A protein has these predicted regions:
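Hydrophobic anchor at the beta1->P-loop junction of P-loop NTPases
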Residues: 84
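Walker A (P-loop) phosphate-binding loop of P-loop NTPases
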Residues: 89
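Conserved lysine of the Walker
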Residues: 92
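Conserved ASCE P-loop ATPase motor domains encompassing nucleic-acid-directed helicases/translocases
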Residues: 1-10
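Hydrophobic positions on the alpha1 helix immediately C-terminal to the Walker A/P-loop
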Residues: 95
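P-loop NTPase motor domains
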Residues: 9-66, 72, 121, 125-133, ...
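Post-Walker A helix-loop "phosphate-sensing" segment adjacent to the P-loop in P-loop NTPases
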Residues: 102-112, 130-133
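A short helix-turn-beta junction within AAA+ P-loop NTPase domains corresponding to the substrate/partner-engaging
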Residues: 133-135, 386-399
Length: 404
């Protein structure tokens, strides 16, 4: 085998300046070239160089700079939402670090980075050295962080005209309509968002439990959230998880309801009680921790990114998005963009309840100057409910795409 002629022959022929086309009469070592190939190699015929607005600068395959800027109104048609896709090991986190460094240098936006694995720790250190304020949040037991998932319930009492339907028959129609009219702006459905949070607490994010949830159950949940909101607004305090649990138990005492409905209400209240005690109670059943004013907020999902914490992760993410939304509403006239970056997005988006929520909230963000950037590794992880979100996002960056 060591003395095989063919490998040695090929090695010699492929040495620089050794190959002689005239000697290759059978055309074993040559192939047809098209005029396009020659044009691509010519210096007068280059590759795309982008829009010329250097918000983000990369290099194309020819080594020339390619520039584009999602935050520039001249570069976008609809929005600056961005989707970064690539298989494992393709460099999503490294690319995001590169992009965020460039965008921060040019626009100095307010950044909210949700990650798992400390991929942006050095970026935070670098930004802090250059004078930016950096706030780090770790979602783990004992971290002292408190997220109030029902904190926005006061809006239901403050603006009752904007409360969406409580009719059980119309609830599924809302979901069908959400998949249509992606381009249209819509009012925020606060009651629908709070219902999603309550359902996640009741079902624990389990498919089997979610399948048991009927439209009548959902209507009762919405009514109990409204009851809790009215009670807490009268007492001038934040709506906590225990208030919704108590409202479910109170309605279960209603003698006019059938026994089966009352038993179901008690069952849902007991399920929510898991989020009112222990570590989950510390995180989700206290008045929310005030977020300090910072240029960059890095949220490490930590414990919640592991298996078995699906409900806690989803509720925490909803609370984070609500926090970003409140800041965006407050600062919408300051002209400073807000970018919410989610790395390892497949951890978040695989929950079918979260996708409609993200679709609704990000549709509003276009008017508030806040942008949703998502990085994930597998499109198959996205549920069908996430299709409107993908249609809405204008900017896609694909890294080393697999053949299929």
């Amino acid at each position: 085998e060591e003395d095989e002629v063919a490998p040695l022959n090929s090695y010699l022929r492929w040495l620089p300046c050794v190959f002689d086309p005239a000697a290759d009469k059978r055309q074993w070592y040559t192939q047809l070239m098209f005029a396009q190939h020659a044009a691509n190699l010519a210096p007068v015929w280059g590759r795309s160089q982008g829009t010329g607005h250097p918000g983000i600068t990369f290099f194309n395959r020819g080594g020339a700079p390619i520039t584009f800027d999602p935050l520039n109104r001249l570069d976008r048609q609809m929005n600056a939402h961005l989707f970064l896709f690539g298989p494992t090991g393709s460099g999503k986190s490294a690319t995001l670090n590169n992009i965020l460094n460039q965008v921060t240098a040019i626009y100095r936006p307010r950044l909210f980075i949700v990650e798992a694995g400390n991929s942006f720790g050095l970026f935070g250190d670098f930004a802090a050295r250059l004078g930016l304020t950096v706030h780090r949040v770790k979602l783990a037991p004992g971290a002292g962080v408190s997220l109030a998932p029902f904190a926005d319930a006061w809006r239901l009492v403050d603006t009752p005209s904007q409360v969406q339907t409580l009719d059980a028959d119309a609830l599924d129609e809302d979901q069908t309509d959400a998949g249509m009219a992606v381009e249209g702006d819509e009012q925020r459905d606060v009651l629908g968002e709070l219902e999603i949070t309550a359902r996640l607490m009741i079902t624990g994010g389990e498919d089997k439990e979610e399948a048991r949830m009927t439209r009548a159950d959902r209507s009762l949940i919405r009514q109990c959230i409204l009851d809790a909101a009215q009670h807490c607004v009268a007492d001038e305090r934040t709506v906590l998880t225990r208030d919704v649990r108590d409202a479910l138990r109170e309605r279960a005492r209603d003698a006019t309801l059938p026994e089966m409905r009352r038993a179901r209400l008690l069952e849902m209240a007991d399920a929510m009680d898991m989020f009112c005690q222990g570590v989950d109670g510390e995180m989700f059943d206290r008045s929310g921790t005030p977020w300090p004013e910072a240029d960059i907020t890095i949220v490490d999902l930590a414990t919640f990114a592991r298996e078995g914490y699906n409900a806690q992760l989803s509720i925490a993410y909803i609370s984070l998005i609500n926090t970003v939304n409140n800041i965006a509403e407050r600062d919408q006239y300051l002209g400073r963009p807000i970018i919410n970056v989610t790395d390892e997005g497949h951890i978040i988006t695989k929950n079918p309840l979260l996708a409609p929520y993200v679709v609704k909230i990000t549709k509003m963000w276009r008017k508030l100057g806040a942008w949703f950037w998502l990085a994930t590794q597998n499109l198959d992880d996205l549920p069908k409910a996430a299709e409107p979100m993908l249609n809405m996002i204008e900017w896609w960056i694909c890294l080393s795409m697999p053949p299929d």
